[in-house]
Amino acid sequence: MKERYGTVYKGSQRLIDEESGEVIEVDKLYRKQTSGNFVKAYIVQLISMLDMIGGKKLKIVNYILDNVHLSNNTMIATTREIAKATGTSLQTVITTLKILEEGNIIKRKTGVLMLNPELLMRGDDQKQKYLLLEFGNFEQEANEKQENALSDYYSFKD
């Protein structure tokens, strides 16, 4: 079985034309069902609808969904920039981001957040696997850098 671009070659079959009696040999090709190149974005419409109803936290979530880069599921913005863009207080942004982090919806580093690719992403199965790995490592890299910085600080201090 040969797979190419989602198509699987299944062999050949002989068919008989009812009118002429001619035997025709045809190749049987089946298209493989794959997840393919997709954008999961149904949540955006739901959040938009809820945003119209109200809620400062929903405005922040909607802003994140509208501004996340679908190439890598990240958004570069400080909490102050998000507060200004959404017309919410800095404390509301901080609280909302903390809730999203605790719910494993986002992970954060200074000035950057990454949206969980299980919630929203664009791409195929391979890209989803890649983004899931990146999401898993996203916070870890920041923690390692912070630990290294603290280690350097304490070694310099002593």
From Swiss-Prot:
Q: Which domain of life is it from?
A: Bacteria
Keyword annotations for this protein, in alphabetical order, are: DNA replication, Plasmid
The record's section on InterPro entries has: HTH_CRP (IPR012318), Plasmid_replication_RepL (IPR008813), WH-like_DNA-bd_sf (IPR036388), WH_DNA-bd_sf (IPR036390)
TM region(s), chain numbering = none
Work out whether the entry's keyword set contains Cytoplasm: no
A GO molecular-function descriptor: DNA binding
BP-aspect Gene Ontology terms: DNA replication; plasmid maintenance; regulation of DNA-templated transcription
Q: Does the keyword Cell cycle apply?
A: no
Looking up Pfam families in the UniProt record yields: RepL (PF05732)
Q: What is this protein called?
A: Replication and maintenance protein
What taxonomic ancestry is recorded?
A: Bacteria, Bacillati, Bacillota, Bacilli, Bacillales
Q: Which gene encodes it?
A: repL
